[in-house]
């Protein structure tokens, strides 16, 4: 049986990493084989691309930014995601193509139709079984990020940019594969909701 593909999305500081840790623990308890991965940086090549994308000392023009994310995703899908799904392993990814649509499409204003065609090429048309959006006002998320130390290149964008990204995610979340949770809740409460989504997939 093919594995399930689950993606976790949200603005900066939304608590994706914490929820992914909860998900991994849950799947382990249920004896469901799984891997945890991320974009960008889910492969050896992707880690190099991630360094280029998020390092503030490397100025990246918007068009190059899109193509770097797509290169990372193409490698990620071909090298890691599809092979694991084919073996019956569940794949949990911290971000996937919805982040490109939210950040580069809604955030930077690139044509969504064009982006979707690029994404379809890079992903071989692979769509998640479930996408969880942890929704959070960007000012709350950025204040959380500030507590971690230095901002990366995307985190340094304006509040207005991050507000557009959030609105983009909410527009994308109209798709039936999405489930939206309130990122202002306690982490345990958020996971209680996510656990219900996982049980629905595994039923």
From Swiss-Prot:
Keywords: ATP-binding, Kinase, Nucleotide biosynthesis, Nucleotide-binding, Transferase. Its EC number is 2.7.4.9. Belongs to the thymidylate kinase family. Phosphorylation of dTMP to form dTDP in both de novo and salvage pathways of dTTP synthesis. It comes from Carboxydothermus hydrogenoformans (strain ATCC BAA-161 / DSM 6008 / Z-2901). One of its GO terms (molecular function) is dTMP kinase activity. Coiled coil: none annotated. It is an enzyme of class 2 (transferase). CDD domains: TMPK. This is Thymidylate kinase. ATP binds at residues 10-17. One of its GO terms (cellular component) is cytosol. InterPro entries: P-loop_NTPase (IPR027417), Thymidylate_kin-like_dom (IPR039430), Thymidylate_kin_CS (IPR018095), Thymidylate_kinase (IPR018094). GO terms for biological process: dTDP biosynthetic process; dTTP biosynthetic process; dUDP biosynthetic process. It comes from the Bacteria. The keyword DNA-binding does not apply. It catalyses: dTMP + ATP = dTDP + ADP.
